């Protein structure tokens, strides 16, 4: 199995509070099952707020209920209360990965950066060299996108 991504994929860095937009507003931030379990078992002052804002939609997906179209953990300075308080490893997969995306196809995994992110778009448009894609062989024994990451529940507990 091969993994293919733009050659500058790993160079992306979120500019967080300096971003002209926020990825923490105007869309449903889905909470993956591992994060949900960790949030429900969390023993921290922030746990009560986490439990209060998690909702389940008609499809059975858990998400953070927005407040005025914004994530309830988005602070006035544009930074995330969860990340600030519990660390980056505490973020649900949606927040941890965006603007990165990953698609598992029959014989390969394709990765990229969403141009919905102003910094990812700026990085692409600022290129002077042609865009190239890098493919590397990866183990194909039951590969699941994101499985290389440490389990969130292990980090929070």
Task: Map each language-model feature to its residues.
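Short loop/turn segments that flank or connect secondary-structure elements
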Residues: 1-49, 55-69, 75-157
């Amino acid at each position: 199995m091969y993994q293919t991504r733009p050659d500058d994929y790993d160079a992306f860095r979120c500019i967080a509070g300096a971003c002209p937009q926020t990825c923490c507003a105007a869309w449903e931030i889905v909470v993956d099952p591992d994060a949900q379990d960790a949030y429900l078992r969390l023993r921290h002052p922030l746990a009560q707020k986490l439990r209060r804002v998690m909702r389940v939609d008609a499809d059975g997906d858990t998400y953070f209920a927005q407040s005025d179209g914004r994530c309830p953990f988005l602070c006035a300075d544009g930074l995330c209360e969860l990340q600030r308080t519990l660390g980056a490893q505490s973020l649900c997969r949606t927040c941890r990965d965006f603007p990165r995306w990953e698609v598992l196809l029959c014989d390969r995994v394709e990765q990229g950066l969403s141009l919905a992110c102003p910094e990812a778009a700026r990085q692409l448009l600022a290129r002077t060299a042609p865009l190239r894609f890098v493919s590397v062989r990866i183990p194909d024994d039951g590969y699941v996108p994101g499985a290389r990451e440490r389990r969130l529940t292990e980090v929070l507990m």
